[in-house]
Structure formats: structure tokens, C-alpha cells
A protein has these predicted regions:
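Exposed alpha-helical structural elements
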Residues: 11, 15, 33, 97, ...
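Residue-identity detector for glutamine
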Residues: 3-4, 17, 50, 92, ...
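Acidic, aromatic-lined catalytic clefts of primarily extracellular/periplasmic carbohydrate-active enzymes
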Residues: 1-85
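Solvent-exposed loop/turn segments at secondary-structure junctions
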Residues: 8-11, 91-96, 130-131
Length: 189
């Protein structure tokens, strides 16, 4: 936000930066209150700032990195569904982490070429939500039992509590893939 020519974007960036450093560096009450105030003042404008920030900081860099390093890959060859999957994974894992997730998913399929888009979506979410039994903190409880993940951990989220991992598991292995597949069915090529 601070690098933008638009004065509104810069003012949002400055306010958030000031809130972050107010009372010592870190997120907390000052930051949360400023975030809420920005949303209350202009929710549409603030949403636009957030989307542009994610696009410039995460989505465009992951697409550029994939297109530069995966021969023949172009995000423009795919529907909004797969592009949204790349957006989501880049925002979650960061550019470097998302690149690893996506290229591992492609490798698990034997490459991305000639793969149905639905398979690419499923493979990316499967890798992002990959399970491991080699972690100190694991998922447990009735919901974990129901999904067959009790005693397991998410490979990319082992530093999180079992409860957080279970919530992320449901998002990565149930909710987001289903929404992406529905979007593909509705808007796909």
C-alpha cells in the first residue's frame, strides 16, 4: 500500500503501519481497531485495497514464478477457478511456499500438461492439505474421527494446534476444493 501512487492506498498503508508500530511492533488491539475503522469508513474501498495488495504481493508473483519455471504453463490458459486456487494458495503459503505446493502437485500428477483442470485443482489442495503422522501436535476429537484424520497432522501446519489444523483441514480438503470444482463447472472452459 505504501508503494502505490494512489493517495487512498498510501493512507491505508500508513494507518495500518502506524497501528502496527504503536506501542511496540506487533499486531494487537491498535491494529485490529484500525483495521475495523478502515472497513467501517469505506468497506468497498478497503476491500479493493486488500485485493490489490494480495494480487500484487502474492498472486502475480506466484503466476510469474510458475510461468518462468514450469515450461508451457500459462495461468491464462485456465479458468477463473484454477486462478482462484493459485490466489488462495499464494495468500496462504506465500509465493515461495505456494510455488512448492503447486509444483509438487503437478509432479504428483506426472506434470500439468494434458491434465484435466479438475485434477489440477484437487492435486493442489491435496498437497496443500497433505497429512503426516510425524508431528508433535495432531488433530483429534469427533470431527477428526469422522474425517479419518485423528492422530494426524497437516504437513504444512505442524506448528499449529490440533484444533487449528482441523479447521484448516476442513477448509483445504473439503470446503475450498468443492467451491473451486463448482466454480469450474459453472465458469470453466
Amino acid at each position: 500500500c505504501l508503494q502505490q501512487d494512489d493517495t487512498y492506498y498510501r493512507s491505508v498503508g500508513e494507518r495500518l503501519q502506524d497501528a502496527y508500530y504503536s506501542g511496540g511492533a506487533g499486531y494487537g488491539t491498535n491494529f485490529d481497531n484500525t483495521w475495523r475503522a478502515l472497513n467501517n469508513e469505506d468497506s468497498a474501498g478497503f476491500l479493493r485495497v486488500q485485493r490489490n495488495y494480495v494480487r500484487l504481493s502474492y498472486y502475480e508473483p506466484i503466476v510469474a514464478k510458475l510461468e518462468a519455471n514450469v515450461p508451457g504453463f500459462s495461468a491464462d490458459d485456465y479458468s477463473i477457478a484454477l486462478r482462484n486456487v493459485l490466489w488462495s494458495r499464494a495468500a496462504q503459503h506465500g509465493t515461495g511456499g505456494a510455488y512448492s505446493v503447486v509444483t509438487r502437485a503437478f509432479a504428483a500428477l506426472g506434470g500439468f500438461k494434458n491434465q484435466p483442470e479438475a485434477e489440477l485443482i484437487d492435486a493442489i489442495y491435496a498437497e496443500s492439505g497433505r497429512l503426516t503422522t510425524d508431528a508433535a501436535t495432531t488433530m483429534s476429537g469427533a470431527t477428526a474421527e469422522r474425517y479419518g484424520v485423528s492422530g494426524k497432522a497437516l504437513a504444512y501446519y505442524t506448528g499449529c494446534s490440533g484444533e487449528v489444523q482441523l479447521g484448516v483441514y476442513l477448509r483445504l480438503r473439503v470446503n475450498e476444493p468443492a467451491k473451486a470444482q463448482a466454480m469450474l463447472a459453472q465458469y470453466g472452459y
